[in-house]
Amino acid sequence: SSAASDVYKRQLAEVLDLFPSKFIHVGGDECPKERWKECPACQRRIREEGLANENELQSYFMHRVEKWLHEHGRELIGWDEIMQGGISKSAVIMAWTDQFRGTDAARKGNRVIMTPKWNCYLDYSQTSDPEKYEPIGPTRYLSMRQVYRLDPYDRLKPAEYRNILGIQGNVWTEYIADFGHVQRMTLPRMAAIAEIAWAYDRKDYDDFEKRAKRLLPELYGNAKLKFSEFFFEDIE
């Protein structure tokens, strides 16, 4: 609706004033499309624009948002759900649901940031028995080895590598009490994220594990950073 357009323009104008970055992340995940099926205004817009379904309605809206951002000299990033109804080649896809959506986007010519939850969600538990060892939080276990398994270029042709802008580790804070807790969830697993980004073609987990256990505790200690000790104590 025109009211929705006015809202996003006002809100994004504030974002642009605050952040001078080239890229603006507009989200696009977890849209309530079941509600859109029951929404008379949504269904009217689908009919008026000749759209096939609610996925295309989201894409229709995203195209308008992206056009507005381009008019203001910025570029759009969105979660991989924005691909479901089709998206422009200029949009940057942040692939979180799984790596293969990012691979698909890169093959189609979109730029991609790989952040699949199975490898990059650092708020996930660091042990297989979180109720015993960790504060309340997500119970899915993400080991250092599993983080390190990520290959952002898997199943891509060399000519498509340029479409991978990089990788990102995420820490969602619903269950995070303070910044020290953020550090403990991020470190040392962020070291695996960093090595994948810098040396994906020279990965060797056994060598990485030896270096990490030898160097990181002192490094973090000297910097007065909090970190999880499970990896260093071989607690899984």
Report each predicted region and the residues it spans.
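Flexible, acidic glycine-rich loops studded with aromatic residues
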Residues: 75-81, 86-91, 96-236
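Short, small-residue-biased leader/transition segments that mark boundaries at the very start
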Residues: 1-7
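Alpha-helix termination/capping residues and helix-transition junctions
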Residues: 1, 17-18, 161
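Residue-level preference for long, well-ordered alpha-helices that form the structural scaffold
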Residues: 5, 50, 54, 58, ...
